[in-house]
Regions:
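A generic fold-level signal
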Residues: 4, 93, 171-172
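Extreme N-terminal starter segment of soluble prokaryotic enzymes
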Residues: 4-10
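Structural alpha/beta surface segment adjacent to cysteine/selenocysteine redox centers
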Residues: 21-122
Length: 212
């Protein structure tokens, strides 16, 4: 008798994606309620490549407006001091590599939360490797080893491979959910305010596949 592999729910995000920060409370509830039915695999999508170039004023303005929009719609907390106290850069690949390192130590969620809180609540810049090293130490990782790994060619290739896989999935942005069942991929509707919406769609999809 062949035992079918457990369905996989992919959660695709970027630790510096403001909508992912807004979705976090709902995602935690969905995880809690769905983890007995599916295997949860997290993947980083990489919003912005490595760059030391200061973020253009127009992009800064757009992102601040996005923060205001998310705060108004979802009640998400943001500390706007970031925009006056830090030099913003449009660069999220370093933070994506940071969570890949943490994943290897079963600390991906802790690192993601540390990056999000640093960025959105404490006006710290996760585009800076020095910030990421401090956060790594805060969650119990070896700061020296982390510093060696964060910009290594091996880790950069790991991120590239992950981004290639993410781009092959049926998604249109971050955060996104995709259910993999019996070799088929199903995009799952993501509701920022209610975990039950995605949960019901996952159950319906699983039942539909089972009854084929």
């Amino acid at each position: 008798m062949n035992i079918k592999p457990k369905p996989i729910l992919y959660y695709i995000y970027d630790p510096m994606c403001s909508w992912c920060w807004g979705y976090r409370p709902t995602w935690l509830l969905l995880q809690k309620n769905i983890e007995s039915l599916v295997q949860i695999n997290t993947m980083v999508g990489g919003l912005a490549e490595d760059s030391n170039v200061p973020m253009p004023e127009t992009t800064q303005h757009f992102l601040q407006q996005t923060w205001h929009k998310i705060s108004a719609e979802l009640g998400t907390q943001f500390n706007f001091d970031f925009w006056s106290q830090c030099q913003p850069k449009r660069s999220t690949y370093p933070s994506c590599r940071a969570v890949i390192i943490a994943r290897q130590h079963q600390k991906e969620q802790a690192m993601c939360l540390a990056i999000q809180e640093a960025y959105y609540l404490h006006a710290q810049n996760p585009s800076e490797v020095s910030t990421l090293i401090k956060l790594a130490e805060d969650i119990g990782l070896d700061g020296g080893l982390f510093a060696q790994q964060i910009n290594s060619e091996k880790l950069k290739q790991q991120l590239t491979n992950e981004i290639i896989k993410v781009r092959s999935l049926p998604i249109q942005g971050f955060p996104s959910l995709v259910l993999a069942v019996d070799g088929e991929l199903f995009p799952i509707r993501l509701d920022y305010k209610n975990w039950q919406t995605s949960y019901d769609m996952i159950l319906a999809t699983l039942n539909s596949v089972a009854n084929k």
